[in-house]
From Swiss-Prot:
The gene is insE. It comes from Escherichia coli O111:H-. Residues 1-21 are annotated as: Disordered. The keyword Cell membrane does not apply. Keywords: DNA recombination, DNA-binding, Plasmid, Transposable element, Transposition. Involved in the transposition of the insertion sequence IS3. One of its GO terms (molecular function) is transposase activity. One of its GO terms (biological process) is DNA transposition. Belongs to the transposase 8 family. This is Transposase InsE for insertion sequence IS3. InterPro entries: Homeodomain-like_sf, RD_transcriptional_regulator, Transposase_8. It comes from the Bacteria. Pfam families: HTH_Tnp_1.
């Protein structure tokens, strides 16, 4: 759950990702102030954890949008390549007929 990291001043606790996730769920249900009091945390910790979680979700959404856009552009490029190949064959055919 938590482990203590020694520093010269005061030992710091590092909370596991599972603990952070559960703390954020609790904060959603009962509010940040009450959750912080119940879990013996600072409110700012919960706010920081929440903003980091939202940033991670936002970047995941961005990655999904980018991969969708990349797939669309690849399909479009393949269509253009096919059209170009057809036009080149037609140009070759008509060039031979004119001779």
């Amino acid at each position: 759950m938590t482990k203590t990291v020694s520093t010269s001043k005061k030992p710091r606790k590092q909370h596991s990702p599972e603990f952070r996730s559960e703390a954020l769920k609790l904060a959603e249900r009962i509010g940040v102030t009450a959750a912080a009091r119940e879990l013996s945390l600072y409110e700012s910790q919960l706010y920081n954890w929440r903003s980091k979680q939202q940033n991670q979700q936002t970047s995941s959404e961005r990655e999904l949008e980018m991969s969708t856009e990349i797939a669309r552009l690849k399909r479009q490029l393949a269509e253009r390549d096919e059209e170009l190949a057809i036009l080149q064959k037609a140009a070759t055919y008509f060039a031979k007929r004119l001779k």
